[in-house]
Amino acid sequence: MFRYLVFLLIVGAVSCQRRKAVYKPCGGSGKLISVEVEPCDSDPCVFKKGTDVKVHVTMVADQDSDTATLDARVKVFGFQMPVPGIETDLCKGTVECPVIKGRKYSVTAIFPVPSLMSLKTEVTFKVIGDKGLSVCGQSDIVIE
């Protein structure tokens, strides 16, 4: 009984750290099914400087493509800046390429939270294939 209770407490603690992100679509004709972020326990998600964030995306591809590129940007002082330290080539171990139109893909990416000033801002994630933009999502975040 005690082991079962400990197991439930651990599962509960871990699951509280992963949350479906509130996002708005921003283009592309692919289907963005879900975006989950960890660690995140609020809306908007609050990230600590110098830590890593894991983003889980489920999407349906709208095009056949030999490539899949991630373009992640964060708004700083009104300018869209690339998120530093991320792998932009999703075919390098994240997505099985070539991408096939109509197939569902689950992508997990790890992003370092830069040690910038504290701010509330917007992050934009785009997945781009050979024929252009496939999916795009925007979400508010807080960096502390």
From Swiss-Prot:
Summary of the function given for this chain in its UniProt record: Binds human IgE in vitro, and may neutralize IgE antibodies present in blood from repeatedly tick-bitten people. Does not have antimicrobial activity against E.coli or M.luteus.
Endpoints of the signal sequence: 1-16
Tissue specificity as recorded in UniProt: Expressed in gut and hemolymph. Not expressed in salivary glands, ovarium or Malpighian tubes.
Molecular function GO terms recorded: sterol binding
Protein name per its UniProtKB record: Mite group 2 allergen-like Ixo r 2
Compartments where found: Secreted
Keywords from the named record: Disulfide bond, Secreted, Signal
Family, similarity comment: Belongs to the NPC2 family.
Protein's UniProt keywords contain ATP-binding: no
InterPro entries per record: Ig_E-set (IPR014756), ML_dom (IPR003172), NPC2-like (IPR039670)
Naturally occurring in which organism (per UniProt): Ixodes ricinus
Description of what induces expression: By feeding.
